[in-house]
């Protein structure tokens, strides 16, 4: 038997019901904040991630699925392609390629889709995983550099998590400075690491020389006591970065979004500048991050684009759903009605009833005329139906149908024109003042 590849999985009902509800809620929130959907390819030129994400990051150095384009392998300019491990670089690439900066305003873009990393599969972490993300990008006159953009994005995330039903989260904030003040911090890190790096893991020993900031990303437990002794970036921020971070915090205080400043948090991507943030949840264990993001004021220029500061985030949808399921197990799937054809020639009539009910927004399952009454009831219960509509030869002839509420056993005869009203309103009858919907006539 062929099975799903290690690190991937199938999403099945009823779990997909929760995934769909999450995505519908997320789309609604994005629309209220004036974000618009963007869809980018799931694979890109490898150079995009090497230049955009950073060659010293774990993502680029260890975790990417990369191959040579066979269609060009014989040419002088063979191309390396990579399944996208994250989507910010791809969105910024699209922003540059399609000259979206020419609009002069902010581009507020969101995406929902799969990403791919060659990670060790574990609880909540897969080699194919799903992200919900958004980016706010624009040339300087658009206000894209404003700390208000950072605060708005973070406030939107607090709203989003509330509306999908996740409570008990913790928000961590930090500022990682910018190109003006970070070099001094990198040098301070390099000097501090010189005497202790030999006691750290191999990756940290290498990064201490090539990219000291990435040492703070280390997840090796034995290295954490050393990392706690290293200089804090907050002590090296220049006045502009300090003012920006203070403004972000003040706005979050004003709108009532709680946070904790974590001076060690740098996030695992080289493009971040100034504000970085993570939302975590205790149900996810040691690696508790549900989402993370930050500002990336130089990414567009690093990819040969115009100056276009931005801020964005990515939600680990797998991890968000896992946290929601831990708090509240998935509910059984339900439908509004099961229409049971009974007797020869009643299938077409039952299908017609299903069509009318569905056109009124009801969730309906069509039975089979080969089923006896008992089997139809069993099928209706398995389907999670609230009502079963009996469509037999007598019912068809009289244009009235037996409708039974499975939870209570209440059964009544209902005219064809009133079926949708009766089911939608939990057994209520029309009093004569209500109009019959067009599809019920």
UniProtKB/Swiss-Prot annotation:
Signal sequence segment = none
Q: What is its EC number?
A: 6.1.1.21
InterPro entries assigned: aa-tRNA-synth_II, aa-tRNA-synth_II/BPL/LPL, Anticodon-bd, Anticodon-bd_dom_sf, His-tRNA-ligase, HisRS-like_core, HisRS/HisZ, HisRS_anticodon
Q: Name one GO biological process term.
A: histidyl-tRNA aminoacylation
Please state where this protein is localized. Answer: Cytoplasm
One GO cellular component from the entry? cytoplasm
Reactions this protein catalyses: tRNA(His) + L-histidine + ATP = L-histidyl-tRNA(His) + AMP + diphosphate + H(+)
Keyword Aminoacyl-tRNA synthetase present in the record's keywords: the answer is yes
Keywords per UniProt: Aminoacyl-tRNA synthetase, ATP-binding, Cytoplasm, Ligase, Nucleotide-binding, Protein biosynthesis
Q: Which GO terms describe its molecular function?
A: ATP binding; histidine-tRNA ligase activity
Q: Name one Pfam family in it.
A: HGTP_anticodon
Q: Which residues form a coiled coil?
A: none
Question: What HAMAP family has UniProt attached to this entry?
Answer: His_tRNA_synth (MF_00127)
State whether it acts alone or in a complex, and with which partners, per the record. Homodimer.
Q: Which PANTHER family match?
A: HISTIDINE--TRNA LIGASE, MITOCHONDRIAL-RELATED, HISTIDYL-TRNA SYNTHETASE
Q: Which family does it belong to?
A: Belongs to the class-II aminoacyl-tRNA synthetase family.
Query: What protein name applies here?
Result: Histidine--tRNA ligase
Starting at the broadest rank, the lineage of the source organism is: Bacteria, Pseudomonadati, Acidobacteriota, Terriglobia, Terriglobales
Q: Which gene encodes it?
A: hisS
